[in-house]
Amino acid sequence: MNQWSLRMRILTFCVAVVLAIAYFLFTPPSVDNNAVISSDDDAIARGAYLVNAGGCVSCHLAVEGDGSTNPAILSGGHAMVTDFGTFYAPNITPDVDTGIGDWRAQDFLRALKHGRSPEGSFYFPAFPYRSYAGLNDEDVLDIGAYLLSLNPVNNAVPEHKTPWWLSRFALVGWNLLADLTGGRESELITAQEESLLMQRGAYLARNLGHCGECHTPRNGLGISQLAREFAGAQIGEDTIEAID
């Protein structure tokens, strides 16, 4: 085998490895293709409870033209100013043009549990999908049932304002680093939570309520330091108290 042929084989192998890794990282995650959003009253009622318990209104409340807010409407627009840019909470009413009116069950599962849009792009972690990763599918679908039962509101929110280097593609590396350095909140079930009551509390605090998104410190890349879960944090000029 001549040297040129050997180099080509090595190059071909390296390209194949890179493509395989890219496929693994960028391909939208698999979810239950048989899942459906229910329209019955019980599912909607459970979804309403979950949306309230999860504090969704805190970010997704409507922002009126005069700057006032309306927590009774989830049409979004609230600006979250962070060290990584300004992020605007989206419209989560069932408006087809500016909201989630055309979302299917699989879209809710990929968004909440994997941080991926219906088109497959990555959501910025201002949306706490790493906490929501631990939600069970039934709860996610009930949340979808409730949101799709709301009155649609046409409200196009502003585009996120991020530095030039922070693209959605960069989130591939960010998510990988977060997995390697801290894991996901859904994996933090300890021996202290053996009782069903404590397991339920952990589920509400770590996952649905995503308390750690504010109360757990982060490193310079914005990755939660889960070894210090609920130990308090500094967000901008605000000091978030410890709740551990």
Stretch-by-stretch model annotation:
Residues V51-G54, F87-A89, F122-F124, E138, ...:
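Extracytoplasmic
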Residues N155-V172:
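Extended, well-folded interaction surfaces typified by the phenylalanyl-tRNA synthetase beta subunit core
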Residues S30-N52, D66, L176-R206:
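Electrostatic cytochrome c docking/interface patches
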Residues G47, A53-V63, F108, I143, ...:
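The canonical Cys-X-X-Cys-His
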Residues G77-D107, R130-V140, R228-D244:
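Electron-transfer interface patches adjacent to heme c in soluble/periplasmic c-type cytochromes
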Residues V17-N34:
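Membrane-interface motif at the C-terminal end of an N-terminal transmembrane signal
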Residues A22-F24, R104-P118, S131-V157:
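C-terminal capping alpha-helices of c-type cytochrome domains
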Residues M1-A16:
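N-terminal Sec-pathway targeting helices
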